[in-house]
């Protein structure tokens, strides 16, 4: 009788596990792990020209989700085919391939991969910049002692893990680079993954289309899948996608189960996956951080400028990167030719600073207005009481994170682009200052405390008599 009960209990447990596995698909969660390894190693090997073994050790292996599986993770870098494969104990394999001009993309099956034409590739990165030069061709060391001390602290490592792994710091004041420093293996022209800082770039691409009157922020998002007569998602606006207040079930948790990670690493058509999400709240009433929301904007940008990878690359370089003199940029695409505008742009630290300078100058570069008048103010207004604006983080409002930054000495008018592992841009209009810190930081919150200290000490160095 006791044995029978145990067998019944075991059967119930196994049945429950089967149901849970069918719903939550742990295989998909684990595949996001091999997808991250394959994709990020591909990008940092073939775009950034970094050592893949060092990238795995510094960037991937220490991440919280990898601590339990890194021992079983295997990867192969094929320099001849320009691809990276990764697997977990020989299964759940992922493969990423490099494409000229478009960076790396995960291959999920036999899908056709979007490419850029030779004419587009030849035209990229060659147009004359409108932004005045921020520096010459050599590294600019700090000359003010307190500024040098600030950079020393930004690169200093704690006695034990987790590590800061600062890779680059660039500081631009009143349009001129006043200090920069790079870790070994990195330099002025090294393209560095910005992760979610790319969302601020997508904000700019949307802003350019608004300036050209090809998009309207308070109009419904032009996604055909939502245009059914009885589809409540048809009420979601461009602004609500920018502000992550769409009400869609696309909340981001950072786990292998959340929709953003499954979108990035298990879907060839990322926006197609995201646009299938259901509504869980009325649009504009609920905020939740969501890379998938930004990816929907990337699809809208692609479709508005021609619907192909070739068209969106020409648009991004002609209208944004070339005027700013951003020569190192790789804006990666998914298989459909949609920019991965939520997560995957690589650029040198100087180019990230040039991008920040566009916003510092209210969307004007070389006398030409690129972004609509008032766009920067719109982008940095807090959303529903949070510290998030519309593609930028802000110090405005009463969010605890914003209030903390002000308390430690960061001006109230500052706003930020934040990316995973400590990628940071700070734009501070009252100081005419742009600060970029690129890292592979595994300290709490991507070493936010270290970045805040860098900002405060940089400002102090500009005002020695205060």
Where are these regions (language model features)?
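Conserved catalytic neighborhood of penicillin-recognizing serine enzymes
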Residues: 227-257, 263-285, 292-295, 347-350
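Active-site helix/loop module of the DD-peptidase/beta-lactamase fold
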Residues: 211-249, 276-279, 306-343
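Active-site Gly/Thr loop motif
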Residues: 326-330, 380-434
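Short, charged, amphipathic alpha-helices and their helix-cap/turn boundaries
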Residues: 146-153, 176-181, 220-222, 257-283, ...
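Active-site SXXK
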Residues: 175, 193-221, 241, 297-301, ...
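Structured C-terminal helix/loop/strand segments within mature extracytoplasmic catalytic/sensor domains
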Residues: 29, 414-466
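Beta-lactamase-like hydrolase cores
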Residues: 134-174
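Active-site-proximal alpha-helical segments within enzyme catalytic domains
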Residues: 200-203, 292-302, 343-364, 423-439
